[in-house]
Amino acid sequence: MKTTVYLIRHSVRINTKNLIESWKTSQDKIVKSEKIILSVTGEKRAEILSNEEELQNIDVVYTSNCVRTLQTAKYLLEKQHLKANIDERFDEKRVGKPNDKEYPDWYTRQYEDENFKTEGGESQAEVRERVNEAFQEVVGQNKGKRIAIFTHDYAIMYFLLKWCKLEKVTPNREIKLSFKGKVVFDKRINSPEVFKLTLNDGNEIEEIENIPFDDLEFDDFNK
């Protein structure tokens, strides 16, 4: 019996630089990470996503601890009468201190060096370890089911690098991945973005696919 897992990046979030004038809160770090919400466009795109034929008949849903993933999932949850399982191990990478000046090549470097990180941040390897830990638990508890995991850009891409080969990464955030010699992704990651993983009876990944949707053209908060 095969298990199907959909790794789903959240929809378009707000651009805080454009919409927030000031921060008067003791929780600024949390507000800037976990509590970031979807944009108006992001809400519309999340609802469109919930109606895609590929994502019907889901058995179980997991989300990260961040508001924007739950906001993306809520349309699918309501439509299919499901409840979310929140797991912080699916959270986005902790970026750490701003690094553009000290590491102008930080975007490509974080993909090419799995141990690269800035002060207070996480490395590719660290993110992959926690995401994989959660993933293995999820598939172990839901064998043979159709699983949707709503998570984040880096969390997904770093996790996929456990099985995929990084063919290319560019400063303008274009990424090319291959699985078993076949290119499975070659573009910028969309908001939302969906990857379909098919696992065999032994919970080994047999196939990785990127699922495009014609009614969800590229959009992102930092496009």
Give each language-model segment a name.
Residues M1-T3, E52, N85-I86, E92-P104, ...:
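Acidic, low-complexity terminal tails and accessory targeting/binding regions
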Residues K2-L82:
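Active-site-proximal alpha-helix that buttresses catalytic centers in soluble enzyme cores
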Residues T4-I8, Y62, N142-T151, A155:
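Beta-strand elements within well-structured catalytic alpha/beta cores of enzymes
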Residues R13, A155-I156:
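Short active-site segment of divalent metal-dependent hydrolases/proteases
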Residues I14-N18, D28-I37, L77-E133, R173-E174, ...:
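Phosphate-handling substructures
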Residues E54-N57, V138-K145:
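Glycine-rich phosphate-binding loop signature in dinucleotide/nucleotide-binding domains
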Residues N65-T69, R89, T151-A155:
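Short, conserved alpha-helical segments within structured domains
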Residues Y75, Y158-K162:
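Active-site signature of alpha/beta-hydrolase-fold catalytic machinery across serine-
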